[in-house]
UniProtKB/Swiss-Prot annotation:
<dbReference type="InterPro" id="IPR022955">
    <property type="entry name" value="GMP_synthase"/>
</dbReference>
<protein>
    <recommendedName>
        <fullName>GMP synthase [glutamine-hydrolyzing]</fullName>
        <ecNumber>6.3.5.2</ecNumber>
    </recommendedName>
</protein>
<dbReference type="GO" id="GO:0003921">
    <property type="term" value="F:GMP synthase activity"/>
</dbReference>
<dbReference type="InterPro" id="IPR001674">
    <property type="entry name" value="GMP_synth_C"/>
</dbReference>
<dbReference type="InterPro" id="IPR014729">
    <property type="entry name" value="Rossmann-like_a/b/a_fold"/>
</dbReference>
<feature type="domain" description="GMPS ATP-PPase">
    <location>
        <begin position="208"/>
        <end position="399"/>
    </location>
</feature>
<keyword id="KW-0332">GMP biosynthesis</keyword>
<comment type="function">
    <text>Catalyzes the synthesis of GMP from XMP.</text>
</comment>
<feature type="active site" description="Nucleophile">
    <location>
        <position position="86"/>
    </location>
</feature>
<dbReference type="InterPro" id="IPR029062">
    <property type="entry name" value="Class_I_gatase-like"/>
</dbReference>
<keyword id="KW-0658">Purine biosynthesis</keyword>
<dbReference type="GO" id="GO:0005524">
    <property type="term" value="F:ATP binding"/>
</dbReference>
<dbReference type="Pfam" id="PF00958">
    <property type="entry name" value="GMP_synt_C"/>
</dbReference>
<comment type="pathway">
    <text>Purine metabolism; GMP biosynthesis; GMP from XMP (L-Gln route): step 1/1.</text>
</comment>
<dbReference type="InterPro" id="IPR004739">
    <property type="entry name" value="GMP_synth_GATase"/>
</dbReference>
<dbReference type="Pfam" id="PF02540">
    <property type="entry name" value="NAD_synthase"/>
</dbReference>
<keyword id="KW-0315">Glutamine amidotransferase</keyword>
């Protein structure tokens, strides 16, 4: 009997925390489905979601100001367990009758937590033990406010030197608050603390497993599609590969794969993709030469959002034309959960678009194809697990992500054939050297960016004005946050030397040392 992977679910209310998506990843790792929603979501939506537990995220605001964000009051009245993290703890305390004040000394970074009452959340969990026999935990703090007075019915369950009320609980109503961040890796026991809340307190059954997700996806595809055909666009990336494999597993020969040669793919990528999918999928693959079409559509366009939307529209139009030839009604897309989150029009009721993904916000409103997105609920690492379970080669599964609009958004400003050719060569050199030096799988994503600016240099005995190439490499678990990769200077020097010597149009190479946030991983 197939498991209902959505039967037990956790709702995470986002107060604008940089770690909100990380909380969702941790809950998924525990094996329970969850969704992330803005903290001002309406009561009807929450009741329809019917969560087994609710987590209130941290946030950048202060509860001490009257106009800042609050949790929906009714969540404290429906008998559902609630866990407040950092700001989430503070707003829960304030809303239930406690007091919150600015702290005399803000806590940022490592702290040692002394557990006063281990019941429920901290049961059996410790990093060390104090001389008095109390459990001690290493935790990560990031706050300027503290709960100064507990709400009625609560007791202090942990403290630090700077936070006498570092954790609190109302055991009867199953309300819990943590001033620290259990979701980050700097809190070593954080996963176990969250598991105690999700499994023991909320009593969720961990049905969110790779095997069950595949079974559920196949059933869903079969029910939606019936006997109709599906087109899936291949890009060479893991998302489209897993999408195609899932759809093929569900409906077999009803799948037609389409590889659109936009002229914006990486060097030799068209041949590589055709080889992989004809060999491993055994599915029908149609390659459409759309280079001239994309270049014409992108001519004169320098705005990144416009480039993304144009790429999305051209992709869909190509697929629709192929679909009409084949009488296909469905388009399979490799949309994943971070695409959905980043393309949301608002965050916490007042956010801004981070960027429009060509397979989410960039789809034309008058699209004639019906859409099927089997990965829409999954994070990138979950997609990779699915791919391995489905038997795709590891080299493909762990290939670095590549944006749908391709090199169009790795060329700053307007796109033209000269810029594309230069960027393809520079990117290929960077990736080749990463693989030769065994750094490729030590970083999560790496690529080159073309800057349409000329910088003076010297080649031979003459002054030379050439273009600038930026190199970007990051390390990340979920692509929601990322750290720039501290690659050895000798390695970067070698890559730079090759690029400026092998590509005559380039005179300068720079390396991007910016984390996400504040930057995004892609430059556009």
């Amino acid at each position: 009997m197939l498991k209902d992977i959505h039967q037990h679910r956790i709702l995470i209310l986002d107060f604008g925390s940089q770690y909100a998506q990380l909380i969702a990843r941790r809950v998924r790792e525990i094996g329970v489905y969850c969704e992330l929603m803005p903290c001002d979501i309406d009561e009807e939506t929450i009741r329809d979601f019917n969560p087994h537990g609710i987590i209130l995220s941290g946030g950048p605001e202060t509860v001490t100001l009257s106009h800042t964000l609050r949790a929906p009051a009714f969540i404290f009245e429906i008998g559902c367990p609630v866990l407040g993290i950092c700001y989430g703890m503070q707003t829960m305390a304030y809303q239930l009758g406690g007091k919150v004040n600015r702290t005399a000394k803000a806590e940022f970074g490592h702290a040692q937590l002394r557990v006063l009452n281990p019941a429920f959340l901290f049961d059996g969990i410790e990093d060390q033990v104090s001389p008095q026999g109390e459990p001690l935990l290493d935790v990560w703090m990031s706050h300027g406010d503290i709960v100064s007075e507990l709400p009625p019915g609560f007791e202090a369950t942990a403290c630090t030197d700077n936070s006498p009320l570092a954790a609190m609980a109302d055991f009867k109503r199953r309300f819990f608050g943590l001033q620290f961040h259990p979701e980050v890796t700097h809190t070593p026991q954080g996963h176990r603390i969250l598991a105690h809340f999700v499994i023991h307190i909320c009593q969720c059954i961990p049905n969110w497993t790779t095997k069950h997700i595949i079974e559920d996806s196949i059933r869903d595809i079969q029910e939606k599609v019936g006997k109709e055909q599906v087109i899936v666009g291949l890009s060479g990336g893991v998302d489209s590969a897993v999408t195609a494999t899932l759809v093929h597993k569900a409906i077999g020969d009803q799948l037609v794969c389409v590889l659109v040669d936009t002229g914006l793919l990486r060097l030799n990528e068209v041949d590589e993709v055709l080889n992989v999918f004809q060999k491993h999928l055994g599915a029908k693959v149609i390659c459409v030469d759309a280079k001239d079409r994309f270049m014409k559509a992108l001519k004169g366009i320098s705005d990144p959002e416009e480039k993304r939307k144009i790429a999305g529209e051209q992709f869909i139009r190509v697929f629709e034309e192929q679909a009409k030839k084949l009488n296909v009604k469905w388009l399979g897309q490799g949309t994943i959960y971070p695409d959905v989150i980043e393309s949301a029009k608002t965050k916490t009721g007042k956010g801004h678009i981070i960027k429009t993904h060509h397979n989410v916000g960039g789809l034309p409103l008058n699209m004639e194809l019906k859409l099927i997105e089997p990965l829409r609920e999954l994070f990138k690492d979950e997609v990779r697990k699915l791919g391995l379970e489905l038997g795709l080669p590891a080299d493909l599964i762990y290939r670095h992500p590549f944006p749908g609009p391709g090199l169009a958004i790795r060329i700053l400003g307007e796109v033209n054939a000269e810029y594309i050719n230069i960027l393809k060569q520079a990117d290929a050199i960077f990736i080749e050297e990463l693989k030769k030096s065994d750094y490729y799988h030590q970083v999560s994503q790496a690529f080159a960016v073309f800057m349409p600016l000329k910088s003076v240099g010297v080649k031979g005995d003459a002054r030379h004005y050439g273009y600038i190439i930026a190199l970007r490499a990051v390390k990340t678990v979920d692509f929601m946050t990322a750290q720039w990769a501290d690659l050895p200077h000798e390695f970067l020097s070698k890559v730079s030397h090759r690029i400026v010597n092998e590509i005559k149009e380039v005179s300068r190479v720079v390396y991007d040392m910016t984390n996400k946030p504040p930057a995004t991983i892609e430059w556009e």
